[in-house]
Amino acid sequence: MVFKVLTLFPEVILQATNFSILKRAQEKGLIKIEAINIRDYTKDKHKRTDDYPYGGGFGMVMTAQPIVDAYESIKSSKPHRVIYLTPQGKKYTQDIAKEFSKEEELVIICGHYEGIDQRVIDLIVTDEISIGDYVLSGGEYAALVLIDSISRLVEGVIEKKSVEEESFSECLLEYPHYTRPYEFRGLKVPEVLLSGNHEKIKKWRRYQSLLKTIKSRPDLINAANLTKEDIEFLIKYCESQKIVL
C-alpha cells in the first residue's frame, strides 16, 4: 500500500508516521508513505499557494495550479483513488477504511484555509471524505487518521486476530480491558475474567460490548450482526432502563 500525501507541511506527515506500528510497517515494506510539498509546484514567484476567493468572503482559497501539478508529477499508471479531506465530504467509517485498504495506492490531498479551488475536485478527486463534524487547522491531521486506520487493515501490519476483535469490526464497540494489579484504588477486576472459564469470559465480553454500544453509539446497533441471544439481552437491558429501541 502506497500513500501519497499532497500537503503544505510534509514534515507533519513524515514525523507523525515515524513511530510504532506505522514505522515498523514501513520498515517491513508493507506500506510506503510519501509527503509531497505542494509549494514546490507553484508557479507564483513568491511561492504562494493561496489567493482571495472570487465573489468575496472571508479567508483564502488554495489555488488549483500547484495542487494539480503536484498530483500530475506523482501520478502513476496504477489504478488509484484521490481523496480530498473536507468537512463537506462523506463521513469516514470503518467500512470505508476497509474499502480503501484494498487499493494499491491512495493519493490524499490536505486542504488549508477555506479549502481548495473547486476545479481541483472536478479534475482529479475521486472521493471527498470527512472524519467528523468539527473543524481542524489543516488536512494533515485528518490524513494521519486515514493513514493509521487503513494501514492497520493491510495484511501483516498487525495480527489478524487483533483486527477482528477491535471496535467497529462487527459494528460494535469493544469490551472493557483490565490488567494487573487485581485491585486499584478500590476498584477490582471483574471476577469472571479470573475464572479461567473461556466460555463465560467470551459471553461476558460480548454482553459488555453490547452495553457499551447501546449506551454510547446506539446508531451502530442496527448494522451489527446480532444473535438471538444478543437481542434478548438488549431487550431485557432496555426494558430495565426504560430505553426505547
Curated annotation (Swiss-Prot):
<comment type="similarity">
    <text>Belongs to the RNA methyltransferase TrmD family.</text>
</comment>
<dbReference type="Pfam" id="PF01746">
    <property type="entry name" value="tRNA_m1G_MT"/>
</dbReference>
<comment type="function">
    <text>Specifically methylates guanosine-37 in various tRNAs.</text>
</comment>
<dbReference type="GO" id="GO:0052906">
    <property type="term" value="F:tRNA (guanine(37)-N1)-methyltransferase activity"/>
</dbReference>
<keyword id="KW-0808">Transferase</keyword>
<keyword id="KW-0489">Methyltransferase</keyword>
<keyword id="KW-0963">Cytoplasm</keyword>
<dbReference type="GO" id="GO:0002939">
    <property type="term" value="P:tRNA N1-guanine methylation"/>
</dbReference>
<dbReference type="InterPro" id="IPR002649">
    <property type="entry name" value="tRNA_m1G_MeTrfase_TrmD"/>
</dbReference>
<dbReference type="InterPro" id="IPR029026">
    <property type="entry name" value="tRNA_m1G_MTases_N"/>
</dbReference>
<keyword id="KW-0949">S-adenosyl-L-methionine</keyword>
<dbReference type="GO" id="GO:0005829">
    <property type="term" value="C:cytosol"/>
</dbReference>
<dbReference type="InterPro" id="IPR029028">
    <property type="entry name" value="Alpha/beta_knot_MTases"/>
</dbReference>
<dbReference type="InterPro" id="IPR016009">
    <property type="entry name" value="tRNA_MeTrfase_TRMD/TRM10"/>
</dbReference>
<comment type="subunit">
    <text>Homodimer.</text>
</comment>
<feature type="binding site">
    <location>
        <position position="111"/>
    </location>
    <ligand>
        <name>S-adenosyl-L-methionine</name>
    </ligand>
</feature>
<protein>
    <recommendedName>
        <fullName>tRNA (guanine-N(1)-)-methyltransferase</fullName>
        <ecNumber>2.1.1.228</ecNumber>
    </recommendedName>
</protein>
<keyword id="KW-0819">tRNA processing</keyword>
<dbReference type="InterPro" id="IPR023148">
    <property type="entry name" value="tRNA_m1G_MeTrfase_C_sf"/>
</dbReference>
<feature type="binding site">
    <location>
        <begin position="131"/>
        <end position="136"/>
    </location>
    <ligand>
        <name>S-adenosyl-L-methionine</name>
    </ligand>
</feature>
